[in-house]
Amino acid sequence: MQYNPTAPGQIRESLISSINSLFACKKTSFNSPDTAFSRTRKISLVQTVLFVMTAGSGTVNNELVDFYGENSLPTASAMIQRRNQLKPEAFRELFLHFTQKAQILKKFRGYQLIGADGSRVNLPYNPSDAFSHINCIQGRKGINQVHLNTFYDLLNDIFLDAELQGIREMDEKGAFCRLLGRQKDSGRKQIFIADRGYASYNIFGHAIHNKQLFLIRVPAAFAESMYKGPKHWLEKETEDESITVHIGRRRTKKNAQLQNYHCLSKSRHYDFIEPGSDNTDALQFRVLKFPIGEDSYEYIVTNLPKYAFPLQTIKELYNLRWNHEVAYRYLKYAGNMVHIHSLKRDFLFQEIYAKLTLYNFSSFVASAVGDIKKKTKKYTYVL
């Protein structure tokens, strides 16, 4: 089922349907598959999930009053017991199940535009949690954070996929590769757009081997190091060069004969060639340079074809990446992700995936309401 953009009520029904679909995967969703949510009680599965999604910055007791009203109010301990019956994977499954129903209405020349970015989420102080606690400055109180990596539809305002990492094990590039892998069988024409924190031959290799298109901003030093040839490489103010980079792990005579050969050390990730292997890989892409101010330039690496995506189009596509930054701001503040309640790690994961689902639900409804206004030309004005 995909959403009818003219029926906001159906979006809520579809969310409820996605929540109830967790009963079909009890083993991966419930901590006690045979007994969890098997009896009719004051707090149902739907109410448990919706409470976690919509909880704001108040105490659990205050949030329960807002959610249920003062009549037939359950206790905070009863809600916690219900949440304990759910695995954090249940909320991830809900997020993906609900999101996958969405129609991709807006495209760029037939392509779905997907931004990749990460953001830190502040958590309640808990020095005993090694997963999220870190001491940033010696002698001062530490903080608790997790790193949220997401793929985001830049034109349709939807978070498509996400991966959470502890602050000590943060690896944005590794998360990008895993998220890429989960999109390769989507059946859609897609372009992945990311900032210079994702400049990596491993990422380029994953996209190229998956036959996926990408556009990634890179630091000047990275761009200039990509071609081991004449010094005039990227010397002009505006450049659009097509190059092949040969990747390997050993400095052999055979490899040295390859044009533009790059030998990667053991410490550098490249998932397609094991350290010590004689194998090589060839990656083909474009490197672009253009001015953005006086003595200031942007560098882009992409495998988009030049005939269909000239320089001006590349600039236009990259500028759309800022929609992802805006979405994170709304997710954290309007979506209350800055008000995580729990110290328990499983509950943290529940709340973060619940807020991602709430963001997408709100985006679907806003899009549907906007579509209705366009078609009816009836607008409500607040005076």
Model segments located where?
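Short acidic (Asp/Glu) patches
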Residues: 96-100, 128-137
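Conserved beta-strand elements of the Class I
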Residues: 112-114
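Short edge-strand/loop segments of extracellular domains
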Residues: 70-72
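Single, function-defining residue in the core of a domain
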Residues: 1-58, 66-67, 79-86, 93, ...
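Short Lys/Arg-enriched helix C-cap and helix-to-coil transition segments
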Residues: 90-105
